[in-house]
C-alpha cells in the first residue's frame, strides 16, 4: 500500500509543479448542490474536449485572476499518464506533459517513464524532452529503443480523443469536501458501455472487465483559480493494493513569473 500512497502524493506534487510552473435530508440537498458545482467547474475545461489539434489552445483563453501580469496571455498545460501494477511491489507510470505558451505560441514538455517501489527504494524516473509543432510531437532527446521512440512520437493526450458528454448523466456520486484546503472530490461508477471506457481499454490494452470508477478532484476555488488544479482519473483497479488507471488534467496558468 505504501508505494500506492507515495504514487498518489507524487502525482499531486507533479501536477502542482506543472500547474504553478508552466445523513439528513438537509445534508443530502447540500451535498447534491456541491456535487453539481464540482461538475460545472470541471465542465469549464472538459467541454472543450476533444481537442484534436492542441494548437487550437493558442487561441483559447482560460480563467484569469490577479496572478496574471498585464499582457500575459497565459499558458495551457495538458497532462496524461497511465499507471499500472505490472509486478508485485512495483508500479509503472508513463505519460506526457506539455506546456503551450500563448505568448510565444510554442509548446514544450517531456515524456516520462517512472517505476515506484513498495520497499522504500527511490523511484526510477526517466524524462525525454519533447516539443510540438504543427500538432505533431517531436522528440528532442535520443532514444535508442525504437518501440519507446514510436510510442512517444505517436502519443495522444486523453483530451485529444475524449468525448466526455456522457459524464453529464452521472449523478448521486460519492462527494468528499475539505473546506480548509479547499479541495473537492466526487466519484462515480462508470459503465463499460461508455465510449470513453471502450476507447481507453483499446488504447491501453486494459483486459479487466471491472467497471471503472470516475474520480474528479479539484484543488482551489470551484469558480476558478490559477493556483489550483482539476484532476480527472478513470480507475480500472481490481484490488485495493493494485493500480490501473488513467489520469488527465488541463490547466491554464500565468506564463510570466
Swiss-Prot record:
Lipid-acceptor residues (N-palmitoyl cysteine): 23
Record's signal peptide: 1-22
Predominant cellular place of this UniProt entry's protein: membrane
Keyword terms of this UniProt record: Cell membrane, Lipoprotein, Membrane, Palmitate, Signal
Localization of this protein: Cell membrane
InterPro entries named in the record: Csa, Csa_sf
Highest taxon above the source species: Bacteria
A Pfam family: DUF576
Cellular component aspect of the GO annotation: plasma membrane
Membrane protein topology class: Lipid-anchor
Record lipid sites (S-diacylglycerol cysteine): 23
Family in the record: Belongs to the staphylococcal tandem lipoprotein family.
Listed name of the protein: Uncharacterized lipoprotein SAUSA300_0410
Organism: Staphylococcus aureus (strain USA300)
Taxonomic lineage: Bacteria, Bacillati, Bacillota, Bacilli, Bacillales
